[in-house]
Amino acid sequence: MKNTSKFQNVVIVTIVGWLVLFVFLPDLMIIGTSFLTRDDASFVKMVFTLDNYTRLLDPLYFEVLLHSLNMALIATLACLVLGYPFAWFLAKLPHKVRPLLLFLLIVPFWTNSLIRIYGLKIFLSTKGYLNEFLLWLGVIDTPIRIMFTPSAVIIGLVYILLPFMVMPLYSSIEKLDKPLLEAARDLGASKLQTFIRIIIPLTMPGIIAGCLLVMLPAMGLFYVSDLMGGAKNLLIGNVIKVQFLNIRDWPFGAATSITLTIVMGLMLLVYWRASRLLNKKVELE
C-alpha cells in the first residue's frame, strides 16, 4: 500500500509539474508580453501599455476575427451535416464491422495534417486529379478554380476536422435506447417526428461536443488558410503567426492570442451551460 501511495504521489507531482512548466508559465508569459511594448532590437520593451488590445478594435483586425468566426461556423455546420449520417451509419453496423471502420476513421490522425492538406491541395488544383477526372468525363469544359477561395478553406477545415465531429456523435448515437425509439413508432410517430423530437434531443450532447471540437481549432488552423485560401482568406491564426514570425511584433501577437483564448473560453462556457441545462432536462423527463 505504501509503495502504491508513493507511486501515486510521484505521478501527481509529475503531472502538476508538467502543467505548470509547459502550460501555466507559458500562458503567464504570453499574458505579460501582451501588456508590453514592441522593440525592434529585443522584440519586447518593458514598458506597460494597453495599445496592443486597442489595436484589435481596428476594423481590419476586427473583420479578420469576424471572418474567422464565420469560416469556423460554416466548417462546423458542414462537419455536422456530413458527420451525423456517417456516425449514424457507423453506429448501426454489426459489431464485427465497427472496429474496422473506426480504425479507418482514426488512421488519418497518424499522419501529419499539414501533409494531408498538401495532398488535398494537389487534388483540388486546376491541373489536379479532380479537374482532370471531370474533364475526362466531359462534365466540364474548362478546369474549375477551387483553390485560393473561401470554399477551398472550408473544404480544408472539414477535411481535417470531420473525425472530431464523428466520434462524439457516434458515441451518443450508440447509446440511444432502442425500446424508446420502438415505443415512439408504436405510438404513431413518423420517422421524421422520431428524429426531431427524440433522437436529436438525446444526441444533443454529442452534437454540442462535436461542434465545440471542430469550431475551436478551426479558428486557429492558419496553415489551412495559407495553403488553401491564400492572402485574401486570412484567419485569426494567420494574424498571430505573422505577428510572431514575420513582423516580430510579439506584444501584439500575444494580445491577439489572448483575445482568441478568451473567445474560445466563452465558447467552452456556453458548452458547459448547455450541457448542464440538457442534463437537467433529461433528469426532469
Where are these regions (language model features)?
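Interhelical loop and adjacent transmembrane-helix boundary motif
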Residues: K2-Q8, Y53-L60, A218, D226-R273
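C-terminal transmembrane helix and the adjacent membrane-cytosol boundary/short C-terminal tail
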Residues: K2-K6, V10-T14, L36, Y170-R185, ...
